[in-house]
Amino acid sequence: FERVGEIESQIWDANGHGKVDGVIALDTIVLQRMLALTGTKVTTPGGDVLDGNSTSDFLLNGVYKKYTDPAQQDATFALVANAAANGVFGNIGKVNIAKLASTIKSSVDEGRIAVYMANDNEEAMLEDFGFAGTVSSDTKVPETGIYTSACYGGKMFYYLASDIDVGKGVKNSDGSITYDMKVTFSNQLDSAELGTLTDYITNGGGFDGSLHFFVYLLAPSGGKISDITTEGTFYGADEY
């Protein structure tokens, strides 16, 4: 995430907003958890009430169902972001510290929060506390990265489900350890709902309701990925 933060900072500055000290990224689940902790509720221009239960689904999917005009979507996002920030920070003093710490820790562990600081010393501290969004370099506790990104427009990633199964390690004659890993992706959109969605969500055309995406596999530190097999439609692979 350090590189992402650097690029985002440069984009912000290049667009005339000035230099920033850092960049914070969090997903809609974190926002929903913070609203729940602080008892904050946000009402959208269309009358939807976002709270500790409904926020993530609305921001990832509901807003696109309700508003077909991107300008309306952007206005809703801006209002929600402003109201949520004011509500959360305005009520943060009333929150149980232990619950707040637990929520932040679990969100960081799940990769839902990442922070970048332009100051090298501050960035090093973030890395020590697990906030920097770095890839593990610990060869004794190997981590394999699995990342996805969409090939086309639309908002179909809301319907993407994934499951990862890591087998028990098998020690090889050279002392290395091999792990079998199975990654399963599935499309959770059913035909009944598909008929109610706009092309803006489903991609439209020949891709209507289907999921097309890139999968990036990052080998663990000191290790490698081998013997890849696939099922379903697969368009090939490159190694970097």
Which residue ranges define each predicted feature?
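Lumenal/extracellular ectodomains and adaptor appendage modules
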Residues: 1-6, 39-240
